[in-house]
Design a protein with these regions (language model features):
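Short beta-strand scaffold segments in enzyme catalytic cores
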Residues: 28-34
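Immediate flanking context of iron-sulfur cluster ligation sites
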Residues: 71-83
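Glycine/small-residue-rich phosphate/adenosyl-binding loop
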Residues: 41, 58-67
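Local cysteine-cluster metal-coordination motifs and their immediate loop/turn environment
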Residues: 82-100
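Short beta->alpha transition motifs characteristic of CBS
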Residues: 40-47
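A short, polar/charged loop-to-alpha-helix boundary motif
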Residues: 49-59
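Zinc-dependent deaminase
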Residues: 1-20, 94-170
Length: 170
């Protein structure tokens, strides 16, 4: 798949994160793309509005997808997300059998932006360290280098600035 295709899906994930933020949640979004390039599922963060501590976009999408699709189908899919999946979400992606993950911002960069805020507690255990134990060889792509160049556009797209991302002052 071309970089332009990855960028297209990441831009849609940004739109989903804007929708999540507008609904009162933190701005995270994820979507699932099948092997033909069709978006088959979208999910924003629901942690705050639904009062579900595991309501991250990626974990919720993985749970929904595993209920709706077969493991074989999901192995050929790609999950796109605005930020690198946390350890919990990486586990959900693994158990759902989603074959690929593409994210725009590393977990460590997210931690730099949010600081140690109780709404974004992190294990500092990126999916890049969780997935290598997977014997099925799930694949992931870090588009962070290019994403860094797009970050001001990302902040503008979700309606905030770097200083007020997630409503926190840095």
């Amino acid at each position: 798949m071309s970089y332009q295709s990855h960028e297209y899906y990441l831009r849609r994930a940004i739109e989903i994160s804007r929708e999540a933020r507008a609904a009162g949640n933190t701005p995270f979004g994820a979507l699932l793309v099948n092997k033909d390039g069709d978006i088959v599922m979208e999910q924003g963060n629901i942690e705050i509005t639904d009062k579900i501590c595991t309501g991250h976009a990626e974990a919720t999408l993985a749970a929904r997808a595993s209920h709706e699709f077969t493991k074989d189908f999901l192995w050929d899919c790609t999950l796109y997300t605005t930020a690198e999946p946390c350890a919990m979400c990486a586990g959900a992606i693994y158990w759902a059998n989603i074959g690929r993950v593409v994210y725009g911002m590393t977990e460590r960069r997210l931690l730099e932006l949010t600081g140690s805020n109780e709404q974004n507690p992190t294990f500092d255990l990126p999916c890049r360290e969780v997935f290598p134990g997977d014997k099925r060889q799930l694949r992931w792509w870090d588009l962070f280098r290019k994403w860094k160049q797009m970050q001001p556009k990302f902040m503008k797209a979700i309606g905030t600035s770097r200083r007020t991302l997630y409503g926190y002052v840095f």
